[in-house]
């Protein structure tokens, strides 16, 4: 048997989930096409405890989070940025000063943090369960986190219903169990509040139905483990077993005195509010039994990353679906895309340090989807399109990616005010401003909506934000309208500090070789 194995080292991935209660990291490698978990790390951070009534994250909570990220960074040494995905969930969605935390995190861990929407979180949780559980058929997946609860019905890796509600074991502890006091009234109020938050989706979920219900969170895992210790060896959660558990919990007066078999010390402060939410979910959806799933958000993120390496990007499906939904003129979208990317490739050659693969992909989708707002009105098209892109549920896109796509589309025509641009943490201005310029030119050069008016050759020369666009010899004699549009565009550029657009024609016709 040879001592040295010459087979290539398996690709390793890391997914980090910045939850409201705990930060989790899971590391995996792909062996023969299968994902193999090789390490897990979890730190209780209590981020949501530091979120005040003004939705500002306290300095203490930020410090706890940054200390944990520093620990994770040690384990991630040597990982390429493409192999690490860090997602922020409910508390970072809510915190008005989340940007401050993200900027400080950049100095601690050299990987971008993506804040994802509640629905995107729910979709990824479902994918994590679907990839790791052997059960077939339609699944109901529930995840009760520190700040939000996600519910999904789906089948064969396709989510059908996706919902996220602002109720979690940390936020409910503060709202319904002040001082950690446990009594029947507090518990009932929390249980009713949870059921009430699901009122609007109850019938939708019941009508869809499911073959198996799966739970994927710390709360559900804790309930499962306590029930096992209480003699329910299969660990399945049923309404009857939940009532038995509630009865046991109500024997205690406060979180500090809570003593249940199988319940860890660190779980004490959030178990009771989490249990109340679980009871409310059971009540609202009439769940008969719930099984524990090993997979959750971070596993979903891992499989999503691995899929992108195999070019199975869910975002492409999302973009195609949106294009179909809004009846986009696919030929025009393709013309704009081709012209924009023709110029992008020239810009990238001249400015390689500013090129960003993720931004390139977002530019492509923005070019394809810049006319989604036509269904509302042609007047203000750029604003309507941006609104749709920013406010639609777009599976696969994190919040910043979605906002970036909306921003590119919002400024693809008319005047530009740089002061109105949103702030981004994942992308720098010098990286994305050229993409706005490229998309503007790509759209403008296809205003006639005919392939015949697109120049056969186009040369772009860039010097910072001073651009020269060179057209074939005598091309404008046949395309006077395009020249008028370009002259108007030059005026828009002059209104932006530092931007200049020069238009030229080749001095002599190109001679074919």
Swiss-Prot record:
Annotated localization: Cell membrane
Gene disruption: observed consequences: Deletion mutant accumulates polyP.
EC number: 3.6.1.11
GO biological process, one term: polyphosphate catabolic process
Transmembrane segments: none
Variation of activity with pH: Optimum pH is 8.
Membrane topology, from the record: Peripheral membrane protein
Annotated control of activity: Activity is redox-regulated. Highly sensitive to inactivation by oxidation. Strongly stimulated by potassium salts.
Leader sequence segment: none
Cofactor field: Mg(2+)
GO CC field: plasma membrane
Major location (coarse): membrane
Gene Ontology molecular function terms on file: exopolyphosphatase activity; guanosine tetraphosphate binding; identical protein binding; protein homodimerization activity
Keyword set, alphabetical order: Cell membrane, Hydrolase, Magnesium, Membrane
Family annotation (Pfam families): Ppx-GppA, Ppx-GppA_III
InterPro entries, sorted: ATPase_NBD (IPR043129), Exopolyphosphatase (IPR022371), GppA/Ppx_hydrolase (IPR050273), Ppx_GppA_C (IPR048950), Ppx_GppA_N (IPR003695), PyroPPase_GppA_Ppx (IPR030673)
Catalytic activity of the protein: [phosphate](n) + H2O = [phosphate](n-1) + phosphate + H(+)
Family: Belongs to the GppA/Ppx family.
Subunit structure as annotated in this protein's UniProt entry: Homodimer.
Function comment: Degradation of inorganic polyphosphates (polyP). Releases orthophosphate processively from the ends of the polyP chain. Has a strong preference for long-chain polyphosphates and has only weak affinity for smaller size polyP of about 15 residues.
Name the record gives this protein: Exopolyphosphatase
Organism of derivation: Escherichia coli (strain K12)
Lineage: Bacteria, Pseudomonadati, Pseudomonadota, Gammaproteobacteria, Enterobacterales
